[in-house]
Amino acid sequence: DIRVLDCTAFNMPDGNGGIRAESGHESWEAEHIPGAGHADLVTDLSDESAAFRYMLPPVSQFAKAMSGYGVGAGTRVVLYDSTSGSWATRIWWMLRVFGFDDAYILNGGLHKWKLENRPLSTEAPAYPPAIFHAKPRAGLMADQSEVLSAIKDGATCVINALSSDQHLGKGGANYGRAGRIADSVNVPAGDLMDTVTHAYLSAQQLAERFSSVGANSESRVIAYCGGGIAASNDAFILTLLGYENVAVYDASMSEWAADASLPMQTG
C-alpha cells in the first residue's frame, strides 16, 4: 500500500534577521497531489521540549504521528513538498533514523508536478491508521560534541548545506553569528537540483559536487545547516550515491552559532 505525504513547511522571516517555523498545513489544504496527506513537521514531528526548532522528536511521538498518517509495516511512502525538497528529505531522514526504509522522494516535488500539468486536489485522503514499529538506528544524527571532534581530527568531512552567501558570512539568514562551522565545506542543498524543474541533477553531477569538496564515501560525513532541514537533503543525496556513514547535525547552526565558544569562520 502506497502512502503519499506532502511534507511542506515554511521558514519565515521573524523580523529580527532570523527565521521562524510555519506549518504548511494550509498550503496542503489549498492544493496537493490527489491522495496526499500532510505530514506536519512543525506540529507533529519536532521535539516541542527542545531548545531549537525541528529537533528529532522522541520515538513515541514520531511513531504515533506516523501511525496516524497511515504509515507502518507493509506500506510504502512517497514524500514531497512544494518548495525546496528539503522538507521531504527531512522526513525521509527521520524515517531512516527510526528504522523505516520504504520511503521515497518524488523527484521535483509539487513544483515539477504542476509544471507537467498533473491533477491537483483539495480532498483529504482516507488512509487507515497503521502500526509504526520504530527501530532506532545509531549514528545517523550527530551532536555538537561529535562535530567539534570532527573538525579537530580532520578525518570527517563536515558539510554546510546552506547557501554560499551564508557559508561565507555575506548574507542570508544567520543564527546569531554569521559564517560557518570552522573548517567545514559547502555544498548548498539548493545547488543539487535543476533551477527550472526542481528535479535533482544527474548522479554524476551530484557525485562531483561532493567529491569536489573532499567528501569520501569511505569516511564519515556530517551535514549541517540552520536546523537540520537543508542538511537532510545533502544527506539524502549522499546516501543515494552510496555513502554509508552519513549523519545530520540536528541542532546545526541554531545551536552552534549561539555558543560563542565554538569556532566559526567567514570569508
Predicted regions and their residues:
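Cytosolic catalytic domains that perform sulfur/thiol-centered chemistry
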Residues: D1-G267
